[in-house]
């Protein structure tokens, strides 16, 4: 047999073998900010990322997101964290309110003794400024203090309001998991 026949036979055999595997019908899209993927109703509050692997004594960023909101003029968010494992290093305004015609007010309070951070974002005045859609309300930089797993959860006191200060029902809450090693 000639060398070209052997090479051709090997290539054709390889193609038959490699094409024999079926492609799995699994969904590979698992973005926690995709409203078709989340397992709760909208509007909702969630975190991104929802799973964080961090080294002990290192910083990591997490964003608080409002998903599927309509006519949002203000938000009050309380995020609970394990005070023995995490420490808030910085909190700053996200991008959802920053795209509006009016500058928003952003205020936060970290209660490290009880393990929560309150974040208030709103528009002031009677201009009826509001935003809609999905976007970041705040960015928080945490420092991991100890090795282990801890959760970041939203408190039931969280509130979203429209320009007339009417509550917008929050139908879902995501949570985050921090694994520090």
Predicted regions and their residues:
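Acidic, low-complexity intrinsically disordered segments
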Residues: 19-181
């Amino acid at each position: 047999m000639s060398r070209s026949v052997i090479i051709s036979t090997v290539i054709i055999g390889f193609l038959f073998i490699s094409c024999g595997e079926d492609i799995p019908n699994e969904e590979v899209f698992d973005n926690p900010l995709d409203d078709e993927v989340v397992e709760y109703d909208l509007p909702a509050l969630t975190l991104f990322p929802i799973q964080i692997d961090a080294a002990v004594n290192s910083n990591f960023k997490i964003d608080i997101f409002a998903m599927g909101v309509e006519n949002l003029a203000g938000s009050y968010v309380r995020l609970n964290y394990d005070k023995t494992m995490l420490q808030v290093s910085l909190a700053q305004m996200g991008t959802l309110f920053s795209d509006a015609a009016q500058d928003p007010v952003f205020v936060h309070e970290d209660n490290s003794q009880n393990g929560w951070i309150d974040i208030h974002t709103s528009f002031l005045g009677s201009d009826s400024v509001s935003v809609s859609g999905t976007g970041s309300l705040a960015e928080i930089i945490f420092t991991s203090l100890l090795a282990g797993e801890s959760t970041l959860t939203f408190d039931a006191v969280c509130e979203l309001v429209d320009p007339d200060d009417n509550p917008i029902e929050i139908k879902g809450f995501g949570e985050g998991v921090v694994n520090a090693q």
